[in-house]
């Protein structure tokens, strides 16, 4: 017996062909985007939306400043001569630093914590050129290393007199948000001040689920996911990374049973000649081999042709009087033999639930006339 004989055969799941990315009105798409996935089976919108939201908010890594030291700074509650901001405000400004750098697998640095030193030297001419107040920005502090600042013009402190000092930054990689009391530095300097670290590049994730349709069946989900980032990653990158994180975690549950599930594929009209499909759709119900019970059920529901049958969603068929799961199973198997299925989208033939009976008659007459002429 082949390995495939042990596989379980499941009915197909409706899945989107692709995820659409759209801008959020009035906002730049490199930081704000809307993603739409449809159709999804009922309930899968919330299942995927909630999982992706959590992974986006807590799973993505980015660098952040976790500590700093500065010449003459003994603690965070002091003022510095010749500097407008006190140390508390300098800390707040450092927390607003948005750093980019992704450790590559083949990089010698990897994910190690890095210490960057910057020498700041401001003389009278610098002050004169700046009207007496020289701003020191984030870019001025990134003299070493290969970190890129998304907001390089972020002001860290402002100098009002000639000064020479050294600023030391310790930068680490992490996820989410880590308060300073949870950051442990083994080689912490005596006057090194540890900061709260906001690692996550994702600032906001919202999602909602709407109804959508497949053919005439509206019992499907449309997932709308709104992602906002701080610019260190794009929303598209963030969604791709979070999906990989979830896939990694789901994989640990995959091999709990030797049996595998094989999903049936949806019927695609494009794969078959349209004329062949039409010849099947105009067939009368009495022209295919169904049990008397199933035939009578369809007749009582005023379903006369295969076209009228296949356009019906499965739940709607079950609403007809005396139509049970046994008849449903028989009909689905018969349609499968014909390479058809319930709930088919016949819009490319101009056929909907509101006109299917008339359209089937029109197509039958058209094909009959063509055969006579031929």
Swiss-Prot record:
The keyword S-adenosyl-L-methionine is assigned to this record: no
NCBIfam families assigned to the protein according to its UniProt record, in alphabetical order: PRK05182.1-2, PRK05182.2-3, PRK05182.2-5, rpoA
EC numbers on record: 2.7.7.6
Alphabetized SUPFAM superfamilies for the sequence: C-terminal domain of RNA polymerase alpha subunit, Insert subdomain of RNA polymerase alpha subunit, RBP11-like subunits of RNA polymerase
General function of this protein: DNA-dependent RNA polymerase catalyzes the transcription of DNA into RNA using the four ribonucleoside triphosphates as substrates.
Lineage: Bacteria, Pseudomonadati, Chlamydiota, Chlamydiia, Chlamydiales
GO molecular function annotation: DNA binding; DNA-directed RNA polymerase activity; protein dimerization activity
Gene Ontology BP annotations: DNA-templated transcription
Protein family per UniProt: Belongs to the RNA polymerase alpha chain family.
Reactions mediated catalytically: RNA(n) + a ribonucleoside 5'-triphosphate = RNA(n+1) + diphosphate
Domain notes for this protein: The N-terminal domain is essential for RNAP assembly and basal transcription, whereas the C-terminal domain is involved in interaction with transcriptional regulators and with upstream promoter elements.
UniProt xrefs under CDD domains: RNAP_alpha_NTD
EC primary class: transferase
Record flagged with keyword Transcription: yes
Region (Alpha C-terminal domain (alpha-CTD)), start-end ranges: 274-374
InterPro entries from the UniProt entry: DNA-dir_RNA_pol_insert, DNA-dir_RNA_pol_RpoA/D/Rpb3, DNA-dir_RpoA, RBP11-like, RNAP_asu_C, RNApol_insert_sf
Region of interest called Alpha N-terminal domain (alpha-NTD), as start-end residue ranges on this chain: 1-257
Matching Pfam families: RNA_pol_A_bac (PF01000), RNA_pol_A_CTD (PF03118), RNA_pol_L (PF01193)
Classification via SMART domains: RPOLD
GO cellular component: cytoplasm; DNA-directed RNA polymerase complex
Name of the gene this protein is made from: rpoA
Subunit-level organization: Homodimer. The RNAP catalytic core consists of 2 alpha, 1 beta, 1 beta' and 1 omega subunit. When a sigma factor is associated with the core the holoenzyme is formed, which can initiate transcription.
Name this protein carries in UniProt: DNA-directed RNA polymerase subunit alpha
Keywords, ordered alphabetically: DNA-directed RNA polymerase, Nucleotidyltransferase, Transcription, Transferase
